[in-house]
């Protein structure tokens, strides 16, 4: 799976089923701009093809068990990146203090 949008959709679907329009509104809240249907629906299709989400007859999307595992894995990965960034920031601050 690629792209920030796909992970954000999984994050949005972690608590409840939503249709495409509702997902678009949730994305708008988080990103400040609403992606077009031409952006949202291909991402949803890719997620479904990768067995990360389900879609029912009423066009409501939900996470699969695989989607939940992928989201957990992504969260751990992103947390590690931010942890490493914090450590690098501390290192840079300390090295600046040593120069003075």
Task: Label each region the model flagged.
Residues 1-36:
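N-terminal helix-turn-helix DNA-binding core of bacterial DNA-binding proteins
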Residues 13, 39, 53-55:
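Alpha-helix C-terminal capping segments
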Residues 40-42, 46-47:
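Basic amphipathic alpha-helical segments that dock to polyanions
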Residues 48-58, 62-63:
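Beta-hairpin "wing" of winged helix-turn-helix
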Residues 72-100:
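Amphipathic alpha-helical dimerization/coiled-coil segments
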